[in-house]
Amino acid sequence: MPFLWGLRQDKEACVGTNNQSYICDTGHCCGQAQCCSHYYELWWFWLVWTIIIILSCCCVCHHRRAKHRLQAQQRQHEINLIAYREAHNYSALPFYFRFLPNYLLPPYEEVVNRPPTPPPPYSAFQLQQQQLLPPQGGPAGGSPPGADQPQGSQGAQSSPLSGPSRSSTRPPSVADPQSLEVPTERAATKALGMESSSSVASHGELDPGAFLDRDSECKEELLKDSSSEHGGAPPDSKDKTPGRHRRFTGDSGIEVCVCNRGHHDDDLKEFNTLIDDALDGPLDFCDSCHVRPPVDEEEGLCLSSEGQAREHGHPHLPRPPACLLLNTINEQDSPNSQRSSSPS
């Protein structure tokens, strides 16, 4: 080529316009009649370098894309291999689990029965009452049979402030049409007790002796009402069946006994046999039902009118006491309830 020859020789013959030749003493032929001393002055020099740079960039991009694609394929292959190994080894137990003895594992029933069974009741008498309640007609609202427990046991388990709110009258069942009369009588008794309590609180403090006697009588009547109501007997049969009396034990339990005061021996024996057959065990009778039970036994205030106080000396005459059950939410902070409530 002519420009290579110019590098070797000091003079270079160049071909110009119209095939006319000229000689460049220094440099190389440039253009049609010029001599250039540097290669960067040539136009094709920059064209070659531009093509080289573009091709190099294309090669670099292709190489990086191929490298990234290969790395992604390798990662996916490793993930598939790990998943395949886990799925293959999942069915078989590990080696250190195959020789694990069976007595170290919990029983199947213990694992399945979650949550565990509830704790036993506070006394055996309450358990017997729960066993006797399901054959009777349940409440109209379709509540579970465990909610239809006797009011006596509910009042014993509750605290002195929350007991009266729980021992309110339950809705009458469909199978017991005669129990409709019991809530009406109790509502009238509550209204009478509220009026008498307000009048007594305005006059002054109560007489301690009369208050203790009326409180014990009120508690016995409440126990009789609860036993007759849950037993399905009409209110007229209260005098024919003996009442119940409760006393606290040292282990915070409650013992329920039958009060045999004011009843004949024949009726008492018949009632004893019926209770023994129903509860599969003998039930103790109270030695003295006239003794006043502890103060925490029943929550509430028993107030009666002056006519009922005059009849206190005649135990055979029917005396329906007026009982006021304190509301623990509305009357808890009032000063009247603090003066008239029984000490706990």
From Swiss-Prot:
It is found in: Membrane. The modification Phosphoserine is found at residue 173. GO terms for biological process: CXCL12-activated CXCR4 signaling pathway; hemopoiesis; positive regulation of protein ubiquitination. Residues 212-228 have a biased composition (Basic and acidic residues). The chain crosses the membrane at residues 42-62. It comes from the Eukaryota. Pfam families: WBP-1. It is a single-pass membrane protein. Keywords: Membrane, Phosphoprotein, Transmembrane, Transmembrane helix. One of its GO terms (cellular component) is membrane. Residues 132-250, 302-321 are annotated as: Disordered. InterPro entries: WBP1-like, WW_domain-binding. GO terms for molecular function: ubiquitin protein ligase binding. Residues 145-173 have a biased composition (Low complexity). The keyword Cell inner membrane does not apply. This is WW domain binding protein 1-like. The lineage of its organism: Eukaryota, Metazoa, Chordata, Craniata, Vertebrata. The gene is Wbp1l.
